[in-house]
UniProtKB/Swiss-Prot annotation:
Gene: nvd-Hp
Topological type in the membrane: Single-pass membrane protein
EC category: oxidoreductase
Subcellular localization(s) per the UniProt record: Membrane
Coiled coil regions, renumbered to chain: none
Reaction catalysed by this enzyme: cholesterol + NADPH + O2 + H(+) = 7-dehydrocholesterol + NADP(+) + 2 H2O; cholesterol + NADH + O2 + H(+) = 7-dehydrocholesterol + NAD(+) + 2 H2O
Chain's role: Catalyzes the production of 7-dehydrocholesterol (7-DHC or cholesta-5,7-dien-3beta-ol) by inserting a double bond (desaturating) at the C7-C8 single bond of cholesterol. Essential regulator of steroid biosynthesis as this reaction is the first step in the synthesis of the steroid hormone Delta(7)-dafachronic acid.
InterPro entries in UniProt: Cholesterol_7-desaturase (IPR050584), KshA-like_C (IPR045605), Rieske_2Fe-2S (IPR017941), Rieske_2Fe-2S_sf (IPR036922)
Protein name according to UniProt: Cholesterol 7-desaturase nvd
Length: 469
């Protein structure tokens, strides 16, 4: 009862106390002296405050309702224009926010029910080998530590004072404390919050035990696993290979010589219930483009309303192909052809061609080329559980592409991607699907993706026995 009263009334009491303090302070000689002597453009601050307060009051009193309405609408328009032209797009959709049919039920109950009853199917290994995005670069500031659970491992990811990103196993080898929870960055090292052991990020060695007797050396076995890290395309990526092999390839960079520097314009993030391979496989499934993505964007992301007559006058026409890059076996390339149609007639000036380059199992660069520049959506898939992925998408554009246009590319991808999520959240994985000739690229893609699994890649059946995720 006492805690309830405190939580209910304490904020109000604090605000009342703050108001009284300000009122009392306003009458003190010190503040009066400050208002009289602190000058702005040779006029005492107190005079400025008096003029502003008087003029604002007189201005509001002299306005009609129509004038105030106009000012209100103008303010709304200015705010909208600021959001559109100056502010990056940032949208974060949690598990259950999209892709589930609630039918009046609580979101949490529906998500848990579907995940429990869903038939997983005969799954391939659950965590691929390769470069795995762990966190967005912008979310890891200097001196910050993030706790990331991904690909069956627990990571402490931090940014040192040198500006570099480091990733080590989260658990301290001393007594098992999670160093990402309360751990502090000291120089380029991570300090355990439990006993203060200090680990450097390059090799994971313990470099200091603060309470150890002077003159004694740190035990050689006092080290934590460190991971190979690169920072590229807006992501901090780690090299994950269950066989312990060193990196054999590296992701491509969004920047190229023709257009130079690429500028950031926004991020979207989704939590998806699917196997990691299914998200990549979507790029080779060209037949689904017409059925899932053909309806006009205005019809939204709910597949149940794609056939609404309200938006039947507008639609998207799609075509595409997928193939392995002949020079880089870890890269898959999808080419997408698109046109906007009105009343069934494609509008020629809207015809575009975009390219999605799948750099390994979990990183994609989706690029749109225009006569005056290039926009690229960098996509990162982070496997946090066998059937749960976090998909993050950043949009970048070259110098002469305005922010509103770059954001429109990302927003279009955002809406279309949420249509896919509604399928993924409910589907099962078919190890041996019934395919027709026109589906042949799906089989081709599965053979390509299999290179990212190896003999010791964890299986879903093994993980279910241990609940080790």
């Amino acid at each position: 009862m006492a805690s309830f009263c405190a939580s209910k009334f304490l904020p109000g009491l604090l605000m009342l106390g703050l108001g009284l303090a300000v009122a009392l302070a306003s009458s003190t000689p010190t503040l009066s002296l400050l208002k009289d002597n602190l000058k702005v453009m040779n006029m005492p601050l107190g005079d400025w405050l008096h003029i502003l307060a008087t003029n604002f009051t007189n201005f509001v009193a002299s306005q009609t309702l129509l004038t105030l309405t106009i000012f209100g609408v103008a303010s709304f328009i200015l705010r909208y224009l600021y959001q559109l032209f100056l502010k990056p797009l940032n949208l974060d959709r949690a598990l259950g926010d999209v892709g589930y049919v609630l039918d009046g039920k609580k979101k949490r109950d529906v998500v848990n029910d579907i995940r429990r009853r869903r038939k997983s199917g005969d799954l391939p290994p659950i965590y691929p080998n390769g470069w795995i995005p762990l966190v967005a670069s912008q979310d890891l500031v200097k001196g910050d530590v993030k706790y990331i659970s991904a690909v069956g491992n627990e990571f402490a990811v931090y940014r040192g004072e040198d500006g570099e990103a480091y990733a080590v196993d989260a658990y301290c080898p001393h007594l098992g404390a999670n160093m990402a929870i309360g751990g502090m960055v000291k120089g380029n090292c991570l300090t355990c919050p439990f006993h203060g052991w200090v680990f450097e990020g390059k090799e994971g060695k313990c470099v200091d035990i603060p309470y150890q007797e002077k003159g004694k050396s740190v035990p050689a076995q006092a080290k934590v696993k460190s991971w190979s890290v690169i920072e590229q395309n807006g992501f901090v990526l780690v090299w994950h290979d269950v066989e312990g092999r060193e990196p054999s390839w590296f992701p491509e960079n969004i920047e190229e010589e023709k257009w130079g520097k690429m500028y950031y314009h926004g991020t979207t993030k989704h939590t998806v219930c699917a196997h990691v391979e299914e998200i990549s496989e979507n790029g080779a499934d060209c037949a689904h483009l017409t059925f899932v993505h053909g309806a006009f964007m205005g019809s939204g992301n709910d597949l149940r309303y794609m056939g609404s007559k309200l938006w039947s006058w507008a639609s998207h026409s799609w075509g595409g192909k997928w193939e392995q890059d002949p020079d880089h076996k870890h890269v898959g390339v999808m080419t997408v052809y698109h046109a906007f149609s009105l009343f069934g007639m494609p509008i020629e000036v809207t015809r575009t061609e975009s390219t999605a380059r799948q750099n390994g199992p979990a990183h994609v660069l989706l690029s749109f080329s225009l006569p005056f520049g290039k926009a690229t959506i960098a996509i990162g898939v982070t496997p946090i559980e066998p059937l749960t992925q976090i998909v993050t998408q950043h949009v970048y554009a070259s110098r002469f592409i305005p922010r509103w246009l770059a954001k429109s590319f990302l927003y279009a991808e955002y809406v279309q991607f949420e249509r896919d999520i509604m399928v993924w959240n409910y589907k099962t994985y078919q190890r041996k699907p019934l395919l027709v000739f026109e589906d042949r690229l799906i089989s081709k893609h599965r053979r390509w993706y299999s290179q990212f699994f190896s003999e010791n890649s964890p299986k879903f059946e093994d993980m279910k026995k241990t609940l080790d995720w």
